[in-house]
Amino acid sequence: MSGLLCYCRQGFEPELAAELSARAAFVGIAGYARTQRNDGYVLFVCDEAAQLAARLQWRELIFARQKLVVLAELKGLDPKDRITPILAALDGQPRFGDLWVEHPDSDAGKPLAGLARSFGNALRPALRKAGLLTDKPQARLPRLHICFLDGDHALLAVADSSDSAPWPLGIPRLKLLPEAPSRSALKLDEALLTLLTPEEREQLVKPGMRAADLGAAPGGWTWVLTRQHVHVTSVDNGPLREHVLATGLVEHLRADGFHWKPAQPLDWMVCDMVEQPRRVAERMATWVREGWCRHTIFNLKLPMKKRWDETRLCLDLFEQQAEKSLTVRAKQLYHDREEITVLAMRG
């Protein structure tokens, strides 16, 4: 078969299927999504998979944790010898620079984690013997993915390391430090890691910059920014953790973060407030339009139904009302739940 394999958060398969269908139609490539709710992945079947993958950049996909081009689908694998049919299916392929053996991040997929680990150890030497895998990982070469959907059912796929998630399953393994004020700190950590390139992080998040955190309490996002030595105005009627204030980089204003505005322009504004997504999109657009900040990261809490439609509406609303030339990226992060995280950067 030919198509794209994209991983997603369990339960968001319809949103990813709708996104892939809409984006493929926009670039003029015909295809259809194959998925079931709670699978943790979507197959977008099309004849021009490589061309579609080139047009749909991983960083631009909202609900996809990972983006892969399918090479083959193997069913009825013999548990005693899965390697032989995989080698046969890969015959004629160029050499790969790495191998990741995976499973969907779903209730049905997680029990396959042990198989994925052990099979990867068995498959690597066989691939090297066949001339299909380098001795050491080489990022400049395509990366081979084997995704087990069941013990006898696997998808073989390939990734461009420069246009795919650099983590197995598309999940960055971030550790919640004991001093983090809340688990929400992981969301901003992941947003900075996922939505910005390494070069952008170095250029746009510098010591001495000034930021506002709207709806800051108890201080998770503020704490993440202070670890980058950014000066933060934390706006919330609720309290911040004492050790966050003790950094000397934080000014706590007891005010309504949704209506507060700064006295002078800031480098960054971040916001993780529980509010209707369209209201948030409009308020964030006001911040950009009025020049109150150059860059922003904010969350949009999605409704239970028509989440892809609401996502498109909110992003369109934000860009229209911002009235600025922006680079906008959005992702449903691993540490997000019923929400997406949006980055907007001025040039």
UniProtKB/Swiss-Prot annotation:
InterPro entries, per the entry: RlmM_FDX (IPR040739), RlmM_THUMP-like (IPR048646), RNA_MeTrfase_FtsJ_dom (IPR002877), rRNA_MeTrfase_M (IPR011224), SAM-dependent_MTases_sf (IPR029063)
Keyword hit for S-adenosyl-L-methionine: yes
Enzyme class: transferase
EC code(s) of this entry: 2.1.1.186
Listed GO MF terms: S-adenosylmethionine-dependent methyltransferase activity
Protein family according to the UniProt entry: Belongs to the class I-like SAM-binding methyltransferase superfamily. RNA methyltransferase RlmE family. RlmM subfamily.
Function in brief: Catalyzes the 2'-O-methylation at nucleotide C2498 in 23S rRNA.
Listed name of the protein: Ribosomal RNA large subunit methyltransferase M
Encoding gene per record: rlmM
